[in-house]
Regions:
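N-terminal Rossmann-like NAD(P)+-binding domain of SDR-like oxidoreductases, especially those catalyzing
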Residues: 1-183
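ATP-dependent carboxylate-amine ligase catalytic core
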Residues: 187
């Protein structure tokens, strides 16, 4: 795909995968807006040290806030939705936070995309939705298993994305990365 001049939004742009994607879209000529989670320090996560920092339009907001999403998507054509609470262990202590960000946040992204007539939503899920492998290699027919509040929240987000595609014909693609690693990863 030719990204030159494409108006894209990346949610979760300050994180591990989101920061790399944001940089690559800029390198490919995309008109890239990056949504980073608001914080009192005004930092942009991994984008603070990005070599293309000055070529990115950064907006602070929160996917769990509908108005943030409507503003962030204004004038965009494609959204890459990577914003999420991650980390399985903490999800056992704060499951409501995971539902709020991962499920309700995804709902806000999808509703804003629909209201702004976006061309496409690329929704980022996780291999964790499959739980313990029932067979290998795992494929898309593998049963979904919510083995933690985190994985259950991502299953919920995936199903809402699917519903928006089937109910409203919103062009949605769901990707489920496995074992991502590299510079900037969290440990």
């Amino acid at each position: 795909m030719n990204w030159r001049g494409k108006k894209v939004l990346v949610t979760g742009a300050g994180g591990f995968i989101g920061s790399h994607l944001t940089e690559r879209l800029v390198e490919l000529g995309g008109d890239t807006r990056a949504l980073v989670h608001y914080n009192a320090l005004g930092t942009w996560g991994w984008l603070d040290e990005s070599p293309v920092r000055n070529e990115i339009e950064v907006v602070a907001g929160d996917v769990s806030d509908r108005d943030s999403m409507l503003k962030a998507m204004d004038g965009r054509g494609i959204v890459f939705h990577l914003a999420a609470l991650i980390g399985i262990p903490y999800s056992y202590h704060a499951p409501a936070s995971y539902i709020r960000t991962n499920v309700e946040g995804t709902l806000n992204v999808l509703q804003a995309a629909r209201e702004n007539n976006l061309e496409m939503v690329v929704h980022t899920s996780t291999s964790e939705v499959y739980g313990t492998a029932r067979y290998v290699p795992i494929d898309e027919e593998h049963r979904l298993q919510g083995q933690s509040p985190y994985s259950a929240s991502k299953i919920g987000a995936d199903k809402i994305a699917e519903a928006f595609h089937l109910s409203y014909q919103l062009p949605v693609v769901t990707v489920r990365p496995f074992n991502t690693f590299g510079p900037r990863q969290s440990f």
